[in-house]
Amino acid sequence: MLKKKIEEEAAKYRNAWVKKCCYDGAHRNDDETCEERAARIAIGPECIKAFKSCCAIASQFRADEHHKNMQLGR
C-alpha cells in the first residue's frame, strides 16, 4: 500500500533524478524528521520538494499503520 502511494507520487515527476529524490524520502529513518533529512540535500529545490513530499506521505502512512487496532488470539 505504501509502495503504491509512493509510486503514484513519484510518477508526478518527469526527471529520473527527481523521482530518486522522492524514493529516497520514503525510506524509513526514525532518528531524524523529514525537514532535518531534507536540509542535507544539495542537488536543488526540485529534489528537496520531491523528497519532502514523499517523506511526508511515508511518515503519515507509517503513523496511521502503527495505531491500527490489533487483536491477539489467546
Swiss-Prot record:
Q: Indicate the principal place this protein occupies in or around the cell.
A: secreted
Q: Does the keyword Acetylation apply?
A: no
Its keywords, alphabetically, are: Complement alternate pathway, Complement pathway, Disulfide bond, Immunity, Inflammatory response, Innate immunity, Secreted
- Reply yes or no: does the keyword Disulfide bond apply: yes
* Residue span(s) of domain Anaphylatoxin-like: 21-55
Q: Which Pfam families match?
A: ANATO (PF01821)
Instruction: Report residue spans for region: Involved in C5AR1 binding.
Output: 15-44
Q: Which PROSITE patterns match?
A: ANAPHYLATOXIN_1 (PS01177), ANAPHYLATOXIN_2 (PS01178)
Q: Name one GO biological process term.
A: inflammatory response
Q: Where in the cell is it found?
A: Secreted
InterPro entries attached to this UniProt entry? Anaphylatoxin/fibulin, Anaphylatoxin_comp_syst, Anaphylatoxn_comp_syst_dom
Disulphide-bonded residues: 21-47, 22-54, 34-55
Cite a GO CC annotation.
Answer: extracellular region
Q: What does this protein do?
A: Mediator of local inflammatory process released following cleavage by C5 convertase. Acts by binding to its receptor (C5AR1 or C5AR2), activating G protein-coupled receptor signaling and inducing a variety of responses including intracellular calcium release, contraction of smooth muscle, increased vascular permeability, and histamine release from mast cells and basophilic leukocytes. C5a is also a potent chemokine which stimulates the locomotion of polymorphonuclear leukocytes and directs their migration toward sites of inflammation.
Q: What is this protein called?
A: Complement C5a anaphylatoxin
Q: Which organism is it from?
A: Bos taurus (Bovine)
Q: Quick one: which gene encodes this?
A: C5
